[in-house]
Amino acid sequence: VRGTRGGFIRELIESKKYTPEEFAAVQNERKSRGQSANADDGKIVEQQGMTMREKLEHMTATYSDRLTFAKSNIHGWGLVAKVFHKAGSIVTQFKGETCRSTVADIRESRYEEDGVDCYLLKQDDDTVVDCTFQGNYARFTNHSCNPYMYSKIVKVDNENHIIFFARTDIKAGEELTYNYRFESEDGKVPCYCGAQNCRGYLC
């Protein structure tokens, strides 16, 4: 996304798979870190005990209270947390116009010819979400080789949604990032995420 040439995102990253024991250990560790890391004014994203539909509704209702965008040290504008988000909580949905993959390919070529930053993310084998001209703050999410968020396809009311979850505890004021794992058709695109494990390129 973010105006990279040939940067149409064709795959989402699969979440790490845990055994029940490993998952419980990770959750306990995250809870302990979350209690000590909260230096905010008491506003914390809490989603325990909610159904997925309720979580999505809560995400939408609190969107502008939790998220904003600002100039980024990585590239252009970036998505920024306004409050503390616990690891594992829903951060945002990648919203936009849903179109077929064939249409997305045509649009990407047109955006590139017109010099327009394109925001395209694959939802499933047949559909892509185009956030270029309509969508939410999620389109300002920059790439990082060590991101704060990971994605999952969540089905609610028989509709797929691309949801970004907090990969770790996120403090207010931190830029929210995601590993897009681009497929570039025009050569490697430099990465400026600044992470210690930065690969140097987006693909």
What are the functions of these language-model segments?
Residues 1-77, 189-190, 195-203:
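Accessory low-complexity/Zn-finger-associated flanking regions
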Residues 6, 16, 21, 109, ...:
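Intrinsically disordered, low-complexity segments enriched in small/polar residues
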Residues 2, 12, 17, 57, ...:
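Generic detection of intrinsically disordered/low-complexity segments and helix-coil linkers/edges
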